Amino acid sequence: MAKRQVFFSFEYNKDVWRAAKVRNMGRVSEDSTFSDNDWEEVKSKKDSDIKAWIDDQMAKRSCIVVLIGETTATRKWVKYEIEKAYELNKGIVGIYIHNLEDKDGNQTDKGSNPFYSIMTNNGERLSNYIECFDSEYKSSKFVYNDIADNIENLIENAIKNKAPR
C-alpha cells in the first residue's frame, strides 16, 4: 500500500507529544509531516496568515487525520481544518489519542467528537459519516500498536468513503 500524504490536525498545546508519536509511526509519507517549529512560527501570526498556511498544507494532502484528545473538539483551528478538508473533498478520519501517554506519562479523558458540530452541505452532522477510531486498549503501548496497525487502512477508507457533498 502506498504511503499517503496526510494532514494531521490536533490541539497543539495539549497533544503535541501524543501527535508526534502518531506522526512518527512511519505509516504515512514523510512529506506529510511538518515540523513543530513550522506550527510554532505560524501560530504567532494573524488569522489570515494561519488560514493561508493551513490552506496551502491541506491542498497538498489526500486526507486529514484528526487526532482527538480531551479538548480537541473545542479548538478553533481544528474546526477550520476539518471544514477546509470537507470543502476540498479530502478524506477525513478521526483517531482518539487520549490513552497515549504524554511526555510525563499521563493519559487524559476521552474528548468529544470534533465532527459533531460541523454540518455537511445537506444539513447533516459530519459525525454521521466520519469514522473515529478508538482503541479498545487502555495501556498506552497497546494503544500505540493498535493505531500503528490500523492507521493505513483508516486513511484508505476515509479517502474511499468521503462524506457526501
Q: Where are the predicted features?
A:
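Low-complexity, flexible helical/coil segments
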Residues: 40-48, 68-72, 99-105, 129-133
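C-terminal interaction surface of TIR/SEFIR-family domains
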Residues: 5-7, 18, 103-165
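Structural signal for conserved beta-strand scaffold positions within catalytic alpha/beta enzyme cores
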Residues: 34-36, 94, 131
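A broadly tuned preference for mixed-charge, low-complexity surface segments
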Residues: 50-66, 116-126
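Conserved beta-strand-loop-alpha-helix hinge of the TIR/SEFIR fold
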Residues: 58-101
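Short, glycine/charged-enriched secondary-structure capping and boundary segments
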Residues: 21-24, 79-82, 107-110
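Conserved N-terminal substructure of TIR/SEFIR domains
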Residues: 1-60, 149-165
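Short, low-complexity, polar/charged sequence segments that are solvent-exposed and flexible
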Residues: 26-29, 53, 84-87, 113-114
